[in-house]
């Protein structure tokens, strides 16, 4: 079973996505910021992190950068999402595997997640 960590300060949104992913057969966990997300990654060793770009404490770009810098987490797929256009996000960080603009269509998100986990 593939494990996905959803990191988003909008916890209701994260929990809804988590429930949808669980219905699709994934094991999911949620955290509210990048700092909590990094701590959780060490415990659960996910194959994918669905990461909100704009969060307090540690934003998505900083968490993604930390994941890419550590040899033990460098392989984890990152799906960055934001209400900002992707061009604005890429100005600050571009080492993610895919981007999803909020609000997103659930079917599009599921398809993207499935393709990331197959790669």
Regions found by a protein language model. Name each.
Residues 15-23:
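Charged docking surfaces used in two-component/phosphorelay signaling
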Residues 79-81:
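Hydrophobic/aromatic residues positioned on beta-strands within the core alpha/beta folds
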Residues 104-115:
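C-terminal output helix
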Residues 25-32, 40:
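Short hydrophobic/Thr-rich beta-strand motif most characteristic of the beta2 strand and flanking loop
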């Amino acid at each position: 079973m593939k494990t996905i960590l959803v990191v988003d300060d909008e916890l209701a949104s994260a929990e809804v996505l988590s429930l949808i992913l669980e219905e699709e057969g994934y094991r999911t966990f949620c955290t509210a910021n990048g700092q909590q997300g990094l701590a959780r990654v060490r415990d659960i060793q996910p194959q994918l992190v669905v990461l909100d770009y704009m969060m307090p404490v540690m934003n998505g770009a900083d968490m993604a950068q930390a994941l890419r810098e550590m040899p033990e987490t460098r392989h984890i797929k990152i799906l960055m999402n934001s209400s900002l256009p992707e061009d604005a996000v890429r100005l600050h960080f571009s080492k993610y595997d895919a981007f999803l603009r909020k609000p997103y269509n659930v079917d599009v998100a599921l398809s993207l997640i499935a393709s990331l986990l197959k790669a």
